[in-house]
Amino acid sequence: WEQVARQPTSAPDVFASAESLAYVMFTSGSTGQPKAVAIAHRGITRLVMSGRFIHFGPEEVFLQLAPISFDASTLEVWGALLHGARLVLFPPRQPTLEELGAVLVRHRVTTLWLTAALFEQMALHQPQALASVRQVLAGGDALPAQRVREHLSRLA
């Protein structure tokens, strides 16, 4: 704590514009070869401040499950923090369905990004763990409509 106490209490004197580089991610793209993609601050802001596809707010509880090197983590982290929501960090490993379910229940997670396959497995084997989840986002494949209907009927 001594080292922390010696740090400045004011914000760093750094200017970053909307076009400034926020981070670089690597994607395999369509060729399978790693390709660097530069992400500007504007892209993050547009993603998490538009609110056109998801509700952001201080009452939400986001689970940060995606690897930090994956673009979905941008939504999880900044979507929560820039709106005063709570962000629950899952250890950096693949959870079992039971472990994931326990975290969802313990922290009353309301917003969740999962692969379609993982959502389907949770809906089949841990449906009670999804009781507080009001927003499910997925990428890579379409969510299975039957599992979505079942989840929505449990929320009603």
What residues fall within each predicted segment?
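Motif- and composition-driven signal specific to adenylation
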Residues: W1-A156
